[in-house]
Swiss-Prot record:
<feature type="active site" description="Charge relay system; for autoendoproteolytic cleavage activity">
    <location>
        <position position="132"/>
    </location>
</feature>
<keyword id="KW-0865">Zymogen</keyword>
<dbReference type="GO" id="GO:0004609">
    <property type="term" value="F:phosphatidylserine decarboxylase activity"/>
</dbReference>
<protein>
    <recommendedName>
        <fullName>Phosphatidylserine decarboxylase proenzyme</fullName>
        <ecNumber>4.1.1.65</ecNumber>
    </recommendedName>
</protein>
<keyword id="KW-0443">Lipid metabolism</keyword>
<dbReference type="InterPro" id="IPR003817">
    <property type="entry name" value="PS_Dcarbxylase"/>
</dbReference>
<comment type="similarity">
    <text>Belongs to the phosphatidylserine decarboxylase family. PSD-B subfamily. Prokaryotic type I sub-subfamily.</text>
</comment>
<feature type="active site" description="Charge relay system; for autoendoproteolytic cleavage activity">
    <location>
        <position position="236"/>
    </location>
</feature>
<keyword id="KW-0444">Lipid biosynthesis</keyword>
<keyword id="KW-1003">Cell membrane</keyword>
<keyword id="KW-0210">Decarboxylase</keyword>
<keyword id="KW-0456">Lyase</keyword>
<feature type="modified residue" description="Pyruvic acid (Ser); by autocatalysis">
    <location>
        <position position="236"/>
    </location>
</feature>
<keyword id="KW-0472">Membrane</keyword>
<keyword id="KW-0594">Phospholipid biosynthesis</keyword>
<dbReference type="InterPro" id="IPR033177">
    <property type="entry name" value="PSD-B"/>
</dbReference>
<feature type="active site" description="Charge relay system; for autoendoproteolytic cleavage activity">
    <location>
        <position position="78"/>
    </location>
</feature>
Amino acid sequence: MVALSNALSRVFGSLAGYKFPSFIQKGINALYVKIFKIDLSEFEPLENYRSLNALFTRSLKKERPFDKSPNICIAPCDALITECAFLDNDSALQIKGMPYKAHELVGEINPLSPSFFYANFYLSPKDYHHYHAPCDLEILEARYFAGKLLPVNKPSLHKNNNLFVGNERVTLVAKDIQGNRLYFVAVGALNVGKMRFNFDKNIQTNAKARFTQTYSYNPPIKVKKGDNLGNFEMGSTIVLFIQNTAFKDLKEKNVKFGESIGEFHAN
């Protein structure tokens, strides 16, 4: 199953990256935009994308404004927040009634503290696929975990136990502005060709790997709130674990990158 789902994603990624003649590509792009009801008002017109992958990974034409206050946490992506809560004895929900152990997802040996708040951001095929820093960060490590590439939509989340933990993923281990540990997890999914990270081009995903790989940064990589961390090559999921933060009640709400989603408490 792992080999099949990963192979399908590699094939899809290759096809999505193929550049058809311009008049054919424009028609393909138009069909995709129509099927998924994509709003291109913040992006280049569809005829500017020479492949489906270029459309998937489209960049914003203009920077989005966001609150620059250091105590404000912003949404890292355009997404539906499917679950959000404080950890309960190291347990988080991939969806209602489907728990998993947070430390297994992020790659820690010991359970995570109940001071961690988590939020699942589901990026659908229509969404902007880049992900950004939710606050000022120092990235200490990037942990790559090989795994399946099962769909991460709601039917699949209800069907498959430990889906996030079993799927291919990359965990960014970081410190926030208060020195607290923060985990930013990019979860792979079916038809996601690759996950890319702008601060380290050596991180390879969906590359037939069958092992865990850790990329350590000494000194840490400093990124500012709103910086573009990377992108999926189709929709997937970001899971954010963050401490000492008062989050808004955003379960089942759509958010846009740059929206305020919480406020840091003083330690």
